[in-house]
Amino acid sequence: MTSNKALETLLEMCEESNASDLHLAVGLPPRFRIKGSLVPRDDLRAFDAADVEAVAMELGRAAVPLGGDEGVERVREVLLREKSIDGAVTSSSGVRYRFNVYRASDACAVALRRLDSRFRSFAELGVPERIEAFSDERDGLFIVTGPTGSGKSTTLATMIDIINHKRDGHIITIEDPIEYIHKSDRCVVHQREVGRDAKGFNEALVEALRQDPDVILVGEVRELETMRTALRAAETGHLVFTTLHAGDCVGAIERLIAVFPPDEQNSARRQLSLVLRGVTAQHLLPREDGGRVPACELLVNTMASANHIATGHSAQIYSVIETGGNNGMVTLDQSLERLVRSGAVSLRTALGIARYPPQLKQRLGVV
């Protein structure tokens, strides 16, 4: 079987079994994540090093686009130097996948994530519908945070889709890789992939400010200069969306500020307090009936929270969220409480990520 055929067969199996993820490792049969559990298929043999490498090279050529043997050698060269390669591919049935090819135990390994083929509403995703209101903002910064695999990209893709269909403007996305494809509707949408269409996140963001955008999506802000440029874009009339890796909204704010040198952090806090529109933190949890469900925290940046951000009293922001239900705000623990009461997740699961486990148990009447 050719490497292309092997890859296509595996992707078909993902779709047939409604798997969210596929993992390839030397010495093991392919494993599929179904309803949150990583399971093998009885009809597939263990993959040897050549099997895994063949699929890895086929995927790698999608991220390092050169044809024939030259393409394979280029993939090997990049993998040897960088130790991993990110990218995205589309199956013959039109389903899009994000992948990471990486080195492990001196061999190739592969992780693929199946992406939704259609855009869902926030209600369908199970995240606070109040988030949709941020699509009406004309400028400022909105952050989606959470661990890897928590649905951050899906939430932002839904936001971009909503804006694309309800207002006129120019949307620029800067991604690595491009995961969801947006077709221009009321908006003109340009999607730029780092490495293919742009040199880097900051370079693309600087260039975007010369391209008359209304909305900018930055897949992830990792470096100081990118953060500076994103804040400048947000305060000069652009609506900026991005992601960070943090467990909650307060953690995201602190992580953003920590990127700046100590002598710049006070001014960064003041700048952020003015441009921030909101932060949502997401965690995907196993459902009691199978599958996964999001627990979400949401901060809407009010005058009270803006003052706490500006003065460095980040711990007080949690109280603003806790008492901000009238503005659509919700803490992670409040979200967990609702999920436990509805029977969607177990108490044990909720306590595992709760900010204040004893208080959560008390509210649920658990001794």
Task: Name each model feature, range by range.
Residues 1-367:
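Short, flexible helix-loop junctions that flank or precede catalytic/ligand sites
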